[in-house]
Each structure stands twice: as C-alpha cells, then as structure tokens.
Regions:
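Short, glycine-biased loop/turn motifs at secondary-structure junctions and
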Residues: 1-213
Length: 213
C-alpha cells in the first residue's frame, strides 16, 4: 500500500466512526492522488485540523510524510517543519514529535500532538488537541490556545483558556485557566480565570475572573 493509499484508508476508517459522514470525509474518499487530497484538506481545514481525522493524522501522517513531502510542500502544507519564508498560504501540521518545531513568517500552525513549538514573525499557532503542547510566542505572533502551555513574549497576542505566562508587551485574552504576568500590554480575563500579576494596570475582569497579587 502506498503512503497515499494509507492516508486514504485512514480517511475510510475515520468516516466509519462518524454517524453522518461529513462532506469533508466524502470529498477525501473521492481523491485519486495527494494533490487532490491536499486541495480537500484546504477546503475543509477546520474539519481536518479539529475533527476526528486530526487524531488519525497525528498517528499516521509522520511515517508517510517523507514520501509525500514534495507533493504536500508544493500544496503549501508541511509536517513538523516550516520554511523561513512562509506566506499566509502555508499550513504547518505539528504531530507528536521530540524535535522543536519552529514556525516562521506568516505561516499558520495547527498543533495536533505533544510537541514544542516556537513561533516567530507574524505566524499563528492554534492548539486545541494536546495537553502536552508547549508553545512559545515571539515577536508579532498570535496564539489561540485551548490545550497546552504557553509562554508569550514581545508583542505577541494570545487567546487562551489554559495556563499561560506573559511578558514584555503581550496582549492576552483569557477565557479560563491562569495568566502569570510579569509585564504585559493588556490583559482581558473572563470566566474563572486567575490572573497572577504584581499590578492591576490595564487588566479588565469579567464574570468570576480575579486578580491574585
């Protein structure tokens, strides 16, 4: 079985686990090569990166990536790597890996597994699958993090519902979890967020959120 056939078989397996097979899965079943499959992934990206198929990608894609890499990269999709010149078209999938994955420029990164991710430039990181994701945001990056741990620096922006550490000129919107702030530009906290900060300056609280000095 070729790597493409392995991925397509995984699609079949995911589809069988879903009572009403979503349009994204049905579209993948019709693909005949990796280029067509990558086009479907782009069209239905939220289903791919956030749905049941994400778990199968995390488990099976790394082994097949070496063979599929050239065609996937041509479609702007990378696995556990990112080119330094990365326009918004670039998507980075991060699976379970022991290597540090660095994301550059304007790439959009989707963390599916246990990994260390460092983001630079104006890149964006989305993590909603793994509690063992460790993410560092630098420069002008953006993070939308509902699973994992985050350290945010420089002028990065962050939406979070987990435990985060913010420094420098970071803007943080927290919906639960904890915010540990040394320095920051602005913090807006809602839900039951706990904000650990030596100052109350530029901190807005909603709901049951509170500051712990």
């Amino acid at each position: 079985m070729t790597p493409f056939e392995t991925l397509k078989a995984a699609c079949h397996a995911a589809c069988r686990q879903i009572p009403a097979c979503a349009p994204s899965y049905r579209a993948m079943l019709k693909t005949e090569n990796i280029s067509q499959m990558m086009a479907v992934w782009r069209e239905y990206w939220e289903d791919i990166a956030g749905g049941k198929y994400a778990d199968i990608i995390n488990d099976r894609l790394p082994a097949a990536y070496h063979t599929l890499r050239k065609e996937m990269n041509a479609a702007g999709i990378y696995v556990n790597e990112c080119p330094k010149m990365a326009p918004e078209f670039v998507r980075v999938i991060v699976t379970d890996t022991n290597s540090v994955v660095q994301v550059f420029d304007y790439a959009k990164c989707y963390v599916l597994g246990a990994a260390n991710v460092w983001a630079w430039g104006h890149s964006q990181v989305y993590s909603e699958k793994s509690d063992d994701a460790y993410i560092i945001l630098k420069q002008h990056t953006y993070g939308h993090i509902s699973k994992g741990h985050v350290l945010a620096y420089d002028s990065s922006r962050l939406w979070s519902s987990v435990r985060v550490w913010v420094h420098d000129n970071v803007t943080c919107e927290a919906h639960g979890g904890e915010v540990h702030a040394s320095r920051y530009h602005k913090i807006e906290a809602s839900g039951d967020t706990k904000v650990y900060s030596p100052s109350i300056r530029n901190i807005t609280l909603h709901g049951n959120a509170r500051i712990i000095e």
